[in-house]
Amino acid sequence: MKKHKGLKTIGKILAVILVFLLVINIIPPKKNVENNPFLVAKGELPMIAAHRGGGDNNPENTMLAFREAVNTIGVDIIESDLYLTKDGYLVYNHDSYIDETCNVNGDISLEEVEALCEIKENRHYIKDMTLAELEKYNFGYYFEDENGARIYKDVTDLEGTGLQIATVDKLFEEFYESNPDLLFIVEIKNSGELGYEACRILYETLNRYPEYKDQIVIGTFHDEIEEELKANYADLMRGAPTGTAAKFVITQFLGVNIFDNSDFACLQIPTSYDLGIEVYLDKETIIKRAHRRNIAVQYWTINDADGMRELIELGCDCIMTDNPELLKSVLEEYK
């Protein structure tokens, strides 16, 4: 008899839990943002984001790459990282130092540069250089075409060819009139005081190009910069930092998304995380639950055609890639 009562009790508890989960998944969750330009309509193909401007196709983070990505390939989004120079300019570069993307060390091989940079004191950090100093160097110096040829190594007209380091201001100015619908994903890489200053300068720059203010999403891996953006630049859209993204994904897997109180606009994630075991994030459920809250789901960094097809068929909003030419050709298969 006691055994039957125990089973009934367990059954009631499970029923309550089931009803609870059902109810909280029926209740419409609050929208993180009302108008999100990074969302695609149901049934539409994902946007193309040129990661670092499309570093497989052209020298990464240069105006040459950005122009080719927008004007020739027709990407929807430019994605890159931002660093602050010594004299207060925001420039695009993946690393905090420039050695591996330009000829700051003279005519030596990339292998020699990498060996040199193993010692941090040998590196040329952006924060220690002025814009004028940075603009002297060829940021296409080590780029190789599909045949392995360094086709920009001997270019002398760096400004004319777009091989100088690129500033945020120059990029916005380039496309503001011709491409008013262009979208931007940026990551502020500086931390602490430099990161705060980077936020301020980016905001001031956006005030000079107001139409782009609603077309940019900003990310950071630094908690203090995330708090700065939330506190002082709340009108700008933010991407989910790692911890927030993890919390969101976990609540979606558990079906308790109503308890997630985050306010980011874009969920930027890889297709999987290695946490001792491989956790796969290329799931339709994640995308659907994000869409219920007006969150765009953007996957990085996808450079193979099969991976692109998988995400297209899942219904994601954006694929970030080093090879936007390839992604464009894959998307043509679905038209």
Regions found by a protein language model. Name each.
Residues 2-335:
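Phosphate-group recognition and catalysis centered on beta-loop-alpha active-site segments
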